């Protein structure tokens, strides 16, 4: 997102450069104080440019002072470029700050999601432990039972069905009228029951 904004900013700077320079020239012609500051700043910049050129080994340029018109042209160009550069830097800083804030919100949302998942896993693990204790209690009270985990069925419904089935069988044994009835019910045995994992 930063690069598109920079492109828009560069186009904006190019479109505003000439009108801004023109307005600075008009203001410099009407205001003596602003005129003097623009001319003085332009001449100082020109002298610095000459010194840097000489320091780099270029001796072809002669140290000539700028006249008023040339100084105004250079000064207005410097002021307009400095202003537009500050606008571009401001846009860049704003976009960088906005992108950073957006990334921060995404990271916070991701951290909250991980936290919620961890809490759900803890609840599920606690449920599994409780159901495991129930299964162990049933097996300890009925040593001949063979209860194992079936991931394709619901644990709670399977346990309820298991208990209900054995309650019916125990009631049938208690209510058996004859020895044959008792043997018939007992011969069926206690079926093995599949207990599933928690969904």
Swiss-Prot record:
Superkingdom in the source lineage: Eukaryota
Coiled coil ranges = 98-141
Recorded hits in InterPro entries, A to Z, give: OPA3-like (IPR010754)
**Among the entry's GO cellular component annotations, what is one?**
mitochondrion
A single Gene Ontology biological process assigned to it is: regulation of lipid metabolic process
UniProt keyword Coiled coil, yes or no: yes
* Annotated keywords: Coiled coil
Q: Is Transmembrane helix given among the entry's keywords?
A: no
State the family named in the UniProt similarity comment for this chain.
Answer: Belongs to the OPA3 family.
Annotated protein name in UniProt: OPA3-like protein
What organism is the protein native to? Dictyostelium discoideum (Social amoeba)
Lineage at the top is: Eukaryota, Amoebozoa, Evosea, Eumycetozoa, Dictyostelia
